[in-house]
């Protein structure tokens, strides 16, 4: 089983510019899920990790460089996630590789990533890969997460490691439906300790969640070392168990690093995924 410490994170890496799917480094989701009480395949949430790649390039058959953006949709049911530096190195391996067209690039991306994401599992599946060519760059929008801004609150913050005890909900009053947003989410890379900056949107129905406590809780991730996907699942599970909403979704959009941004979405009820639209900070 791969571990984060075995990855290329924090290490000097050779940049390979010929197609090399072996660069992908999958990490099992299970160990971190067990920490938050999620065991086996019976998960209390649905969702996906929405990735955007801003630095994809390859050569056409005449050697002329091609560039594109890519949106990836990785189901949260995959037993593995992809360590982000290995994802970057893998994408760089297309740089001097001659390929017929974007469709061939898309097919290789889908095949290679699906193999790594389901590696070691009897279950196999696919992922979403959408290549955005130059002719559609002007259709890529910038849009902020909608919802009531928690950051307006003047709260004292003293805890900088996850503190779920800050979460409270009023079960004595009628249930509500709310969408709350904060741009103050910060955590650190699990291996390198480098800062990860994000915005988070929380939609729920149920007993009204105390907003000051929720903001303080989100701020408490500030010195916490964990990957993006793991932070969002921890936030989901803490709210789900402490506040006991009827429905809940947690969606975070993290600023890009190495030409990639990662935007995990987890929800208690199956439904449509949010649009993968970047925010101003991304």
Curated annotation (Swiss-Prot):
Q: Which InterPro entries match?
A: GTP-CH-I_C/QueF, NADPH_dep_7-cyano-7-deazaG_red, QueF, QueF_N, QueF_type2
From the UniProt record, list the reaction(s) this protein catalyses.
7-aminomethyl-7-carbaguanine + 2 NADP(+) = 7-cyano-7-deazaguanine + 2 NADPH + 3 H(+)
| Entry protein name | NADPH-dependent 7-cyano-7-deazaguanine reductase
Task: Give the species this sequence originates from.
Answer: Delftia acidovorans (strain DSM 14801 / SPH-1)
Encoding gene per record: queF
**Active site positions, chain numbering:** 189 (thioimide intermediate), 196 (proton donor)
Primary subcellular site in the record, as a coarse category: cytoplasm
Q: Which GO terms describe its cellular component?
A: cytoplasm
Q: Give me the residues that bind NADPH, please.
A: 84-85, 257-258
